């Protein structure tokens, strides 16, 4: 019987790559996003990550008798600015919606749909391990995401028994958007999306390879060599 992976943000750059990779390994792929992913076996579109939409998509997946072996939240965004920026509060609201609420929505979906012993992964940020004065809203929401990861690893965090809650903390991902806005950067120091998908597949298929429940896993690429560090 094939296993199931659910990706929130399955139409974005990272999410679509994860769907593509797992599908190539004969996994049943499920995408939830604001737009359809035609490559996924099941693609659910939502208008927002509010309570009604999330409850509705959970019901739709349950109606297909699908239980999830791996859940990955690849949804999110970035915004710069410090407290003096004219659009600071606008960026705060945007980052809460894109980063923090998507993490909370993921936690609820995972609690309802993940199999016992399953893998649950949120996308944090290496930058949020330190001060982020030039991008306060982004750093704060990613730091809060790290907190959620650890809470879900607790016995009473709400995930099914035996589950592993992890955070992946990239430095810079090699995405079309990053290439567009940082065209002068050294792309050899950016992590290919395929490497992230491959690592998630390793953790999904070999539970012994997983970091300790609640771990934040930082990864950084230098000269096309990626180092993964469990924090």
Swiss-Prot record:
Gene Ontology annotations for the cellular component aspect, listed alphabetically: cytoplasm; phagocytic vesicle
Question: What's its EC?
Answer: 1.5.1.34
An annotated GO BP: L-phenylalanine catabolic process
Any idea which positions bind NADP(+)? 6-30
Reactions catalysed, as given in the entry:
5,6,7,8-tetrahydropteridine + NAD(+) = 6,7-dihydropteridine + NADH + H(+); 5,6,7,8-tetrahydropteridine + NADP(+) = 6,7-dihydropteridine + NADPH + H(+)
Record: active site: 138
Sorted keywords for this record are: NADP, Oxidoreductase, Tetrahydrobiopterin biosynthesis
GO MF assignments:
6,7-dihydropteridine reductase activity; identical protein binding; NAD binding; NADH binding; NADPH binding
Q: To which protein family does this belong?
A: Belongs to the short-chain dehydrogenases/reductases (SDR) family.
Share what the entry says about its subunit structure, partners included: Homodimer.
Q: What does this protein do?
A: The product of this enzyme, tetrahydrobiopterin (BH-4), is an essential cofactor for phenylalanine, tyrosine, and tryptophan hydroxylases.
User: What is the designated name of this protein?
Assistant: Dihydropteridine reductase
Q: Which organism is it from?
A: Dictyostelium discoideum (Social amoeba)
């Amino acid at each position: 019987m094939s296993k199931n992976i659910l990706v929130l943000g399955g139409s974005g750059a990272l999410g679509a790559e994860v769907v593509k990779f797992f599908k190539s390994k004969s996994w049943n792929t499920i995408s939830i996003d604001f737009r359809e992913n035609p490559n996924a076996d099941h693609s659910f579109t939502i208008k927002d990550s509010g309570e009604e939409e999330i409850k509705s998509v959970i019901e739709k997946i349950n109606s297909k008798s699908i239980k999830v072996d791996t859940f990955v939240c690849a949804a999110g965004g970035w915004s710069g600015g410090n407290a003096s920026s004219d659009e600071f509060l606008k960026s705060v609201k945007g980052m809460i919606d894109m980063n923090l609420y998507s993490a909370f929505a993921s936690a609820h979906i995972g609690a309802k749909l993940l199999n016992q012993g399953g893998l649950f992964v949120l996308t944090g940020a290496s930058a949020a391990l330190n001060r982020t004065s030039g991008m306060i809203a982004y750093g704060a929401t990613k730091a809060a995401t790290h907190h959620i990861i650890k809470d879900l690893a607790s016995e009473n965090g709400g995930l099914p028994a035996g589950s592993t809650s992890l955070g992946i903390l990239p430095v810079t991902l090699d995405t079309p958007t990053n290439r567009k806005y940082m065209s002068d950067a050294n792309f050899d120091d950016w992590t290919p999306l395929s490497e992230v998908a491959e690592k998630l597949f390793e953790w999904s298929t070999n539970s012994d390879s997983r970091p300790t429940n609640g771990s934040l896993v930082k990864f950084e690429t230098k000269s096309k060599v990626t180092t993964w560090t469990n924090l």
